[in-house]
């Protein structure tokens, strides 16, 4: 046995080699956390020892039902170190399916997200959000668990029927050998960053998207949301250079680019540029389309794609833009890649050549057969399937392909999808669908074999563009046009217009042909899915589950008329959290201002269905953090900080509490005057003056349609100078709080301190008001020290009694005290409202 073919050896070696190099970035709702190779290994050892403490040992099975992130990665690797068999469950699965899999494999434990209800089982379980807190109590007693290369690492349940799913067994040797096979033909440099957009429950993400880039010392970025806006922002912030994606992702991204080109009236110019680029070297193509590259982060270079067929036209489009697209072929049963296009051996339209140390041949009916160390030893407790899928040591993939003269493999479709025509000829839907999809007005299509009069007929199910108006005659004419392109045996003999927003799809966005065929045969819905950015008709249950989870009440007690505040107890703290959960669950953009004290559950459903989102009437001035702005700020502050000396004498207390402060940090202060910021920043030591200050968006930053010229000049002039002088940024006091919170996360990620006034407004009485609940949620999410600051005496010098009129002229000369308290470390698992009260008392009690 070769210890080098275990994931345990693999991960330990990487930790020793790359040590403090970043391995994982995780973008939470508001900020990004980084974990080095050494930290990743230690966390994984923590998971291994946690399982051992639970009496879960080598060969036992555990489930993971969560979103992508550093916790998921730690659990996967912790199981690899301990020999415990991990069974990943797709995060979109229902609780009943989780319970079914738990019974099938005899699971001992469940790691799950608190975003999902715990299945009614006797399993012990732990929320992944609590994993760090749990691991802090676990001693690392053991580092070698005796894992061998043939030990089972995981069982992956493929997207078959939920009544009888198939569990694919994968060993350590399967995983590591496949990584080595890919790495041998596609080495990459360690300065690359890979962005994860596929679920870790899928092998395409686990190997090419996670373990393969780690083998070269690269970093992998995980997102709390896979919305397009979050993906684009991650590409920019993390300078992503590699993505592993399914073809439909590339197709959707292409359509987005083409829509923008059309909106700008540049279609003809764009087509000419595409035509020209085919004759240019790749650097020139990247320069020609530099605006697109800039939008996608500027450093994105290559896509690895598999999971379904990549249309040659789609591949040529991205290649023409200057990107590298490498298509491969593989299955869960083959631990992903069997063939792959590479830098030196690539052919458009093919899925590449066979990887080293593997074998591929074509069996009867051109079925792809393969064998190698990467191929599964079999299905979990399924002898019938095991007997059917192997022959003389060869694994029968169920896919159809053909080789060209240079042994490039071309994928032709699934054997089970093949339609046997009345003439006895083989018809492959995958050959027909690209032709149909090129027809004007066709969003997508699914070709099936429909039985009529004892014969199997080629039937097209067509999803039309939302804005297109079609009748049957128009569609029939379009089918005729397609048939003129298709071969005689491929002729479409009938069609249906798909009535739903989208086809039902797998977690990798492939169309589920079974439910489509069922609906066409029965003439009734089979539970279709929805387009991106729209809500399924069955979304009510999902919304109720989220609300019940957030409000900590029984879902049965919630009705459509339940009020978010009076019935469910969701105050302003929960508003941002609810919006974040809804946006991620339904892939929407929702404005927090849509929810108020009068919103009911039915109102939430209407808001989600309508995808209401107000326009943001201000931006965040990132130029204020550049070096020229910082130098100018220091010079201006030399003069500005003398102004308070004209009407006050300042005493600073508690500076010793800042001596060992680890930055970045959040400073929270009471709000007595618009001069507060001058006193607080001037009182800070020089090393802490890398700080950004929150200011009310509606006062200094917000411009709305219809605003007067006076308002426009005020915002442009005063907003500019205030931003330059004090590095102010807009904080919404109504809607768009989440945007401001995200910007604060960006500031903290870049090492900036932040000054906040949690009261949300200047006091009109001189007494400190209660802190807004959002400060609890924010400080928990940012996970940095919180420093309480109290300003005393300034209100009596510059009192504000009218909220609509800010006072700038002092009434008298006086004494002002600025008091710094001891930094507070916020418990991320505490009640956010209690955190807000703790922060409030910390400021109130300073003297």
Where do the language-model regions lie?
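Conserved pre-ATP/AMP-binding loop-to-beta segment of ANL
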Residues: 19-22, 139-157, 164, 187-193
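A cross-family acyltransferase "interaction/gating" segment
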Residues: 222, 720, 749-755, 760-830
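Conserved AMP-binding/adenylate-forming
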Residues: 284, 288-409, 415-418, 438, ...
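AMP-binding/adenylate-forming catalytic core of the ANL superfamily
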Residues: 93, 110, 362-364, 372, ...
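Conserved ATP-dependent adenylate/AMP-binding module captured primarily in the ANL superfamily
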Residues: 49, 91-119, 137, 178-195, ...
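Conserved AMP-binding/adenylate-forming core of the ANL superfamily
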Residues: 24-69, 77, 94-99, 146, ...
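Conserved C-terminal "lid"/linker of ANL adenylate-forming enzymes
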Residues: 446-449, 480-535
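Conserved AMP-binding/adenylation subdomain of ANL enzymes
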Residues: 176-193, 200-290
């Amino acid at each position: 046995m070769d210890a080098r073919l275990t994931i345990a050896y693999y991960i330990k070696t990487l930790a020793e080699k790359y040590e403090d190099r970043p391995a994982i970035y995780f973008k939470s709702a508001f900020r990004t956390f980084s974990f080095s190779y050494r930290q990743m290994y230690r966390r994984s050892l923590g998971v291994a020892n946690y399982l051992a403490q639970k009496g879960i040992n080598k060969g036992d099975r555990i489930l993971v039902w969560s979103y992508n992130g550093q916790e998921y990665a730690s659990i996967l690797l912790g199981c690899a170190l301990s020999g415990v068999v991990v069974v990943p469950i797709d995060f979109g699965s229902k609780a009943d399916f989780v319970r079914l899999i738990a019974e099938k494999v005899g699971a001992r434990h469940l790691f799950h997200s608190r975003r999902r209800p715990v299945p009614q089982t006797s399993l012990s379980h732990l929320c992944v959000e609590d994993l760090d807190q749990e691991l802090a109590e676990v001693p690392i007693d053991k580092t070698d668990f005796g894992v061998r290369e043939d030990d089972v690492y995981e069982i992956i349940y493929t997207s078959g029927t939920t009544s009888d799913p198939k569990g694919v067994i994968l060993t350590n040797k399967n995983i590591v050998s496949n990584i080595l096979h890919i790495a041998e033909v596609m080495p990459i440099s360690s300065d690359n960053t890979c962005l994860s957009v596929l679920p870790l429950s899928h092998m395409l993400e686990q190997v090419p998207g996670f373990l393969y880039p780690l083998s070269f010392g690269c970093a992998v970025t995980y997102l709390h949301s896979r919305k397009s806006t979050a993906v684009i922002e991650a590409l920019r912030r993390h300078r992503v250079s590699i993505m592993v994606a399914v073809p439909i992702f590339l197709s959707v991204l292409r359509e987005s680019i083409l829509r923008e080109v059309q909106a700008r009236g540049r279609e003809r110019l764009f087509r000419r540029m595409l035509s020209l680029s085919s004759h240019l070297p790749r650097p020139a193509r990247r320069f020609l389309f530099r605006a697109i590259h800039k939008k996608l982060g500027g450093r994105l270079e290559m896509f690895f794609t598999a999971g379904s067929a990549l249309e040659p036209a789609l591949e040529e489009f991205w290649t023409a833009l200057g990107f590298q697209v490498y298509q491969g072929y593989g299955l869960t049963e083959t631990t992903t890649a069997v063939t792959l296009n590479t830098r030196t051996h690539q052919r458009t339209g093919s899925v590449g050549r066979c990887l080293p140390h593997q074998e591929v041949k074509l069996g009867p009916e051109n079925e792809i057969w393969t064998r190698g160390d990467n191929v599964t030893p079999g299905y979990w407790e399924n002898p019938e399937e095991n007997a059917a899928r192997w022959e003389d040591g060869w694994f029968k993939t169920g896919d159809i392909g053909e080789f060209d003269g240079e042994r490039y493999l071309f994928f032709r479709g699934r054997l089970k999808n093949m339609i046997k025509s009345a003439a006895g000829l083989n018809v492959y839907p995958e050959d027909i669908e690209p032709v149909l999809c090129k027809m004007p007005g066709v969003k997508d299509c699914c070709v099936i074999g429909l039985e009529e009069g004892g014969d199997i007929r080629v039937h097209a199910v067509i999803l039309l563009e939302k804005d297109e108006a079609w009748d049957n005659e128009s569609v029939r004419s379009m089918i005729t046009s397609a048939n003129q392109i298709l071969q005689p045996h491929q002729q479409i003999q009938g069609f249906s217009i798909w009535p739903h927003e989208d086809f039902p799809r797998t977690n990798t966005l492939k169309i589920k042909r079974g439910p489509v065929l069922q609906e066409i045969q029965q003439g009734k819905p089979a539970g279709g899915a929805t387009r991106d950015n729209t809500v399924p008709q069955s979304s009510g249950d999902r919304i109720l589950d989220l609300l019940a989870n957030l409000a900590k009440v029984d879902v049965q007690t919630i009705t459509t008329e339940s009020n978010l505040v009076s019935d469910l107890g969701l105050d302003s703290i929960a508003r941002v959290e609810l919006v974040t959960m809804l946006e991620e669950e339904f892939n929407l953009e929702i404005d927090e201002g849509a929810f108020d004290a009068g919103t009911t559950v039915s109102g939430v459903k209407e808001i989600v269905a309508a995808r209401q989102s107000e326009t943001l009437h201000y931006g965040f001035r990132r130029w204020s953090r550049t070096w020229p702005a910082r130098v100018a700020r220091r010079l201006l502050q030399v003069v500005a900080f003398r102004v308070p000396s004209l009407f006050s004498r300042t005493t600073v207390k508690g500076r010793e509490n800042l001596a060992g402060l680890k930055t970045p940090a959040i400073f929270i202060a009471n709000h007595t005057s618009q001069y507060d910021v001058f006193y607080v920043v001037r009182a800070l030591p020089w090393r802490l003056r890398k700080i950004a200050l929150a200011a009310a968006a509606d006062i200094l930053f917000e411009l709305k349609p219809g605003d007067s010229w006076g308002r426009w000049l005020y915002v442009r002039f005063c907003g500019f100078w205030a931003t330059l002088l004090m590095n102010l940024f807009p904080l919404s006091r109504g809607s768009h709080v989440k945007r401001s919170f995200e910007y604060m996360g960006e500031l903290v990620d870049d090492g900036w301190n932040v000054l906040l006034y949690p009261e949300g407004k200047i006091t009109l009485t001189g007494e400190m008001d209660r802190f807004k609940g959002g400060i609890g949620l924010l400080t928990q999410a940012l996970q940095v020290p919180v420093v309480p600051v109290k300003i005393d005496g300034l209100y009596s010098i510059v009192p504000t009694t009218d909220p609509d009129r800010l006072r700038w002229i002092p009434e008298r000369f006086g004494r002002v005290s600025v008091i710094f308290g001891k930094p507070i470390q916020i418990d991320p698992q505490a009640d956010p409202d209690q955190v807000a009260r703790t922060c409030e008392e910390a400021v109130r009690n300073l003297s």
